[in-house]
């Protein structure tokens, strides 16, 4: 059974005493005494073998849709915790009101239970990973709790106004563009993802999710697009990766021919399945064709990488993915010549 004194305990992980208790890391008031130390060891991820087929994108998407939620695997506890913060902030990106990233406060709820070797070390690493990531983004953890349950972390963001400022589905404007901005510079990896979970693979590396400076730059400029009305629809890229977000944006019956050729090249020739299902935090947003030059200039000014994926389809066509076609520059030139 879990109890709150775990937050006040000192930890010894892999034979090394940790300097701070979880509560001290989170900035809370420590008990006047330290309960008995918790001794545990880390678990390394196993080797993950993926047999991926680029012709089965639809099948993979169906598997991801069927997953109720992403499980927390102990070897990826730190990465999972950082991703929870990033995804919560991305969910807030399109909210009403005026705010910047540093205005936001976090509320964190840990569900945890002692599952033997590796579980308590994973808890400690999730606390340090989450707290360090939040601190590097200059965010306050306003409150936190620990309750008994299957290991998971819930992160909520306190917002100045309820509700979204713009829709999360594509608007039927065939001249408009859908833009993808990854908010982290990590490699596209499948470890710990919903797709890996659906395929029964628990090993392999996960995205690190560590580049908070780049995340902040991306958040600032895309948030300005939302507040200034440049973005006319938008969707966060989180659990399920880019593929799940694209699918969500097409839910209202507007289709999309998405070309990820440039994205795959920028990712070092990464496999399209990895690029589409790796859970790197990011955002998709739709802009009018007349605003393309403006967002291009703003993103270049902030040194933020972006990828034009294509135009919405209003002829009843579903979401289609292309990964070996012309570059986005070629698509832009073709659009200008129409």
Task: Describe these PLM feature segments.
Residues 158-162, 209-219, 260-268:
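A general structural motif
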Residues 1-30, 113-153, 219, 225-338:
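Glycine-/charge-enriched secondary-structure boundary and capping motifs
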Residues 72-76, 209, 233, 286:
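Generic amphipathic alpha-helical segments used as scaffolds and interaction surfaces in large
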């Amino acid at each position: 059974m879990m109890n709150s004194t775990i937050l006040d305990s000192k930890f010894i992980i892999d034979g090394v005493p940790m300097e701070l208790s979880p509560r001290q890391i989170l900035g809370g008031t420590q008990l006047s005494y330290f309960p008995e130390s918790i001794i545990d060891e880390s678990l390394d991820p196993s080797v993950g073998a993926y047999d991926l087929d680029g012709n089965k994108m639809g099948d993979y998407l169906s598997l991801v849709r069927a997953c109720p939620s992403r499980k927390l695997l102990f070897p990826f506890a730190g990465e999972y915790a950082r991703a929870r913060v990033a995804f919560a902030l991305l969910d807030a990106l399109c909210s009403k009101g005026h705010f910047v990233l540093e205005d936001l406060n976090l509320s964190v709820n840990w569900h945890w239970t002692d599952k033997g070797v590796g579980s308590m070390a994973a808890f400690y690493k999730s606390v340090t990973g989450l707290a360090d990531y939040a601190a590097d983004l200059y965010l306050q953890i306003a409150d936190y709790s620990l309750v008994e349950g299957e290991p998971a972390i819930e992160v909520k963001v306190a917002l100045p106004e309820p509700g979204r400022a713009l829709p999360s589905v594509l608007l039927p404007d065939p001249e408009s563009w859908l833009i993808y901005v990854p908010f982290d510079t990590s490699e596209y990896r499948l470890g710990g993802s919903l797709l890996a979970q659906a395929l029964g693979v628990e090993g392999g590396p996960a995205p690190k999710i560590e580049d908070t400076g780049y995340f902040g730059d991306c958040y600032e400029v895309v948030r300005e697009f939302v507040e200034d009305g440049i973005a006319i629809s938008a969707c966060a890229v989180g659990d399920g990766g880019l593929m799940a977000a694209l699918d969500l944006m097409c839910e209202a019956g507007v289709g999309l021919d998405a070309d990820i050729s440039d994205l795959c090249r920028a990712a070092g020739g990464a496999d399209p399945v990895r690029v589409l299902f790796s859970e790197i935090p990011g955002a998709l947003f739709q802009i009018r064709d007349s605003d393309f030059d403006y967002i291009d200039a703003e993103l270049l000014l902030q040194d933020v990488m972006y990828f034009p994926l294509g135009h919405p389809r209003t002829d009843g066509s579903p979401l289609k993915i292309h990964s070996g076609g012309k570059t986005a520059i070629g698509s832009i030139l073709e659009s200008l010549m129409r």
